[in-house]
Amino acid sequence: MKLLKEGIYQLDRNQISHINESDFKNLVESSSKVDRLRSRVLYHTSPNSEPQHMLMCFDSKSIVEVSFHTFGESFLILSGVAQYRFYSTKDGSVINDVRMSPASMKGIFYTYISPNVAHRFFALTKHVVANEVGYSAFSPEKTFYGEGNLYDASNKVKSEELAIQPLIRNTD
């Protein structure tokens, strides 16, 4: 595994059979040391690869703003507990929550996020490790952030606040 920059690693695609325990430990430890408090191992070979596949680790204080992409993405929780919150693009209101945990905990362990759906990820335990697949290359032209009056309050919510709130379920 090659260090590209602090918190971002690249696997050698010619040698993938497993991730060593020490590599996994490095991923978790580095998530608490980088500015945005998340680290990743890139499985894809270049920034333009499609799809883009990453093993990610989020610290509970990780900074993840409301965002939406022009492509779909999948998220599979391997360890820890997390929550996705989905927002209306019309008025910024919360439309649905999905609390996630590993399959071994018999929780919801997989979420697919459709294109152009406003969402935010929250790590609810000290560390959350997950596989993420973006069905396109991540780029500024394909990713938008919820800013302004619609999402200001949503971007200020902290994981520890969200963890004690009831889940919101859309019944439509």
Whereabouts are the PLM-identified features?
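Short acidic-glycine-tyrosine-enriched beta hairpin
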Residues: 88-119
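A short, N-terminal "cap"/entry segment at the start of jelly-roll beta-barrel domains
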Residues: 1-50, 96-103, 157-172
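Double-stranded beta-helix
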Residues: 91-98, 120-172
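Short histidine-centered beta-strand/loop micro-motifs
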Residues: 42-46, 56, 64-69, 76, ...
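Conserved short histidine dyad/triad with adjacent acidic residue
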Residues: 54-70, 104, 115
